């Protein structure tokens, strides 16, 4: 049962890491020009079974015109050691602080594409026809 999914401990620690990283990003203590005036959402954290690597899925909600989402993620990865030290204050109970890795969260984009497909006239027509067939 190796692929049974994350354990309860992994889920609990991942949520604590997500909360701590989100709190640090919200406070704005990272002094970097790329991250200036940008709101970053930490949607999910996945942690390895040994609790030593935490992959944080982030999505920049507002970026400047000359800053891409990839630049934001690269900047967060550049400052991951600093962030790791900062979250250590919130996660004192852990023996080892997990290494933070940041990835761009594309789930919001996928949701909007699916929503647009479901609202398309072709799908609406098919749904309308299937409702009449059931009557």
Swiss-Prot record:
Q: GO CC annotations?
A: cytosol
- Do you know which SUPFAM superfamilies this protein is assigned to? Ribosome-binding factor A, RbfA
Gene Ontology biological process terms in this record: maturation of SSU-rRNA
Would the keyword Transcription turn up in this protein's UniProt record? no
Q: Which is one Pfam family of this protein? A: RBFA
Q: Where in the cell is it found?
A: Cytoplasm
Q: What is its main location?
A: cytoplasm
Q: Does the keyword Cytoplasm apply?
A: yes
**Entry keywords, A to Z:** Cytoplasm, Ribosome biogenesis
Entries under Gene3D superfamilies matching the protein: 3.30.300.20
MF terms per GO, please?
ribosomal small subunit binding
PANTHER family in alphabetical order = RIBOSOME-BINDING FACTOR A, CHLOROPLASTIC-RELATED (PTHR33515:SF1)
Subunit structure of this entry?
A: Monomer. Binds 30S ribosomal subunits, but not 50S ribosomal subunits or 70S ribosomes.
What NCBIfam families does the annotation carry? PRK00521.2-5, rbfA
Q: Which family does it belong to?
A: Belongs to the RbfA family.
Job description of the protein? One of several proteins that assist in the late maturation steps of the functional core of the 30S ribosomal subunit. Associates with free 30S ribosomal subunits (but not with 30S subunits that are part of 70S ribosomes or polysomes). Required for efficient processing of 16S rRNA. May interact with the 5'-terminal helix region of 16S rRNA.
HAMAP family in UniProt: RbfA
- Tell me the protein's name: Ribosome-binding factor A
Q: Which organism is it from?
A: Bartonella tribocorum (strain CIP 105476 / IBS 506)
Provide the taxonomic classification: Bacteria, Pseudomonadati, Pseudomonadota, Alphaproteobacteria, Hyphomicrobiales
């Amino acid at each position: 049962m190796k692929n049974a999914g994350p354990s309860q401990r992994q889920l609990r620690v991942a949520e604590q890491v997500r909360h701590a990283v989100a709190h640090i990003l919200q406070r704005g203590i990272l002094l970097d020009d790329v991250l200036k005036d940008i709101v970053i959402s930490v949607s999910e954290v996945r942690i390895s079974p040994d609790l030593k690597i935490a992959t944080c899925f982030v999505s920049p909600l507002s970026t400047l015109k000359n800053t891409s989402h990839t630049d934001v993620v690269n900047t967060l990865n550049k400052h991951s050691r600093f962030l790791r030290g900062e979250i250590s204050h919130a996660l004192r109970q852990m023996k080892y602080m997990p290494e933070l890795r940041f990835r761009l969260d594309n789930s919001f984009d996928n949701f909007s594409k699916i929503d647009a497909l479901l609202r398309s006239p072709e799908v609406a027509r098919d749904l309308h026809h299937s409702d009449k067939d059931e009557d």
